[in-house]
Amino acid sequence: MTFSVDKVRADFPVLSREVNGLPLAYLDSAASAQKPSQVIDSEAEFYRHGYAAVHRGIHTLSAQATEKMENVRKRASLFINARSAEELVFVRGTTEGINLVANSWGNSNVRAGDNIIISQMEHHANIVPWQMLCARVGAELRVIPLNPDGTLQLETLPNLFDEKTRLLAITHVSNVLGTENPLAEMITLAHQHGAKVLVDGAQAVMHHPVDVQALDCDFYVFSGHKLYGPTGIGILYVKEALLQEMPPWEGGGSMIATVSLSEGTTWTKAPWRFEAGTPNTGGIIGLGAALEYVSALGLNNIAEYEQNLMHYALSQLESVPDLTLYGPRNRLGVIAFNLGKHHAYDVGSFLDNYGIAVRTGHHCAMPLMAYYNVPAMCRASLAMYNTHEEVDRLVTGLQRIHRLLG
């Protein structure tokens, strides 16, 4: 199948609008991607003609809604090549998935004197839950430091492991730098030391295929809204043997086998014991449509197009005076930068006046900002619906801002 960015753009209604009298150039997909009509329509159709509570009744609408929900679980398992659909838990997003692991597996397996390894490039969602866990149990949080080029100092990693290391929690792709970490060697090293591995895949799954069996990670988590799906839905993958051993984190309906006031409560089997309460069924349906949409385009086709676009963008940005780029040459999805001494918010505001949407701030990565000694950065995201013309507009906009502000 030949990838056509024009055909892809036609599926995204918002891309036809104007901002400040100019065509929208949406370069903020790493924060949250836009939604194709196929996703919007699938969720709307479900609410119009097929909505009912799942796992709640024997009537037709409930049975059909339950079947649709479980079919999405199966589709998601194929998307990341899990061994079984029952290794996947529906969560609100990457943040909840990581917190689930920290509060279920973590509370059961991390003790005083143990340690967890993260990196200096992590999103706060892959820092704070582990800080909280370590504070609760008296464990130590160890950090893989950064290199100036935005890669990790992997030579330090072997010395961070010891017999008390319980977990390596690492991002697949940095949400600021676009660095893709060498997971295979990191996971192998962790397993050699008896540690489990959690991978934050929020910035990876939309850019190229992910195979959790080939990676051999123990946990993998991602969000639907960055994958052209709805907000409020994500996937947590856990190896089946681990998942079956994990206790529930939240209590309520759907996650129980029996409830007795005198004899207590027993849990249903995984993954359903981690899905207390009425789920975001509409969001799950929309996620299924997003997975179907991306799969039909072909992740390898998407990867090839986006990489060509990234190479073009990096080469064109070299023409902007006083522009500082952060991260390695080989990267996925994002370009973080600052223009001279101007605050990222000011640069982002000017770009918005030109119809260009970029993200500004610390990007939920304050330790990374501290490493580079800046309060904030601008971040342009490149997704499958972005074009060379939009890159040119970004470059022209930055050149214009430099002329205006000096």
Curated annotation (Swiss-Prot):
Gene Ontology MF terms in the entry: cysteine desulfurase activity; pyridoxal phosphate binding; selenocysteine lyase activity
Cofactors needed by this protein, per the record, are: pyridoxal 5'-phosphate
Q: Where does the signal peptide begin and end?
A: none
Q: Which UniProt keywords apply?
A: Cytoplasm, Lyase, Pyridoxal phosphate, Transferase
Q: Which GO CC annotations does the UniProt entry carry? A: cytoplasm
Subcellular localization(s) per the UniProt record: Cytoplasm
Name the pathway. Answer: Cofactor biosynthesis; iron-sulfur cluster biosynthesis
Looking up InterPro entries in the UniProt record yields: Aminotrans_V_dom, Aminotrans_V_PyrdxlP_BS, Cys_dSase_SufS, PyrdxlP-dep_Trfase, PyrdxlP-dep_Trfase_major, PyrdxlP-dep_Trfase_small
The organism's place on the tree of life at top rank: Bacteria
Q: Which Pfam families does this chain map to?
A: Aminotran_5
**Modification sites for N6-(pyridoxal phosphate)lysine:** 226
The Gene Ontology biological process annotation of the record reads: cysteine metabolic process
Active site (UniProt): 364
Where are its TM segments located? none
E.C. number(s) listed in UniProt:
2.8.1.7, 4.4.1.16
Q: List the catalysed reactions.
A: (sulfur carrier)-H + L-cysteine = (sulfur carrier)-SH + L-alanine; L-selenocysteine + AH2 = hydrogenselenide + L-alanine + A + H(+)
Say what the protein does: Cysteine desulfurases mobilize the sulfur from L-cysteine to yield L-alanine, an essential step in sulfur metabolism for biosynthesis of a variety of sulfur-containing biomolecules. Component of the suf operon, which is activated and required under specific conditions such as oxidative stress and iron limitation. Acts as a potent selenocysteine lyase in vitro, that mobilizes selenium from L-selenocysteine. Selenocysteine lyase activity is however unsure in vivo.
Query: What HAMAP family would the database entry show?
Result: SufS_aminotrans_5
Give the family per the record: Belongs to the class-V pyridoxal-phosphate-dependent aminotransferase family. Csd subfamily.
Describe, as the record does, how this protein assembles with itself and its partners. Homodimer. Interacts with SufE and the SufBCD complex composed of SufB, SufC and SufD. The interaction with SufE is required to mediate the direct transfer of the sulfur atom from the S-sulfanylcysteine.
The cross-references to PANTHER family, in alphabetical order and at most eight, read: CYSTEINE DESULFURASE (PTHR43586:SF25)
- UniProt-recorded name of the protein: Cysteine desulfurase
Q: Which organism is it from?
A: Escherichia coli O8 (strain IAI1)
In the UniProt record, the gene name given for this protein reads sufS
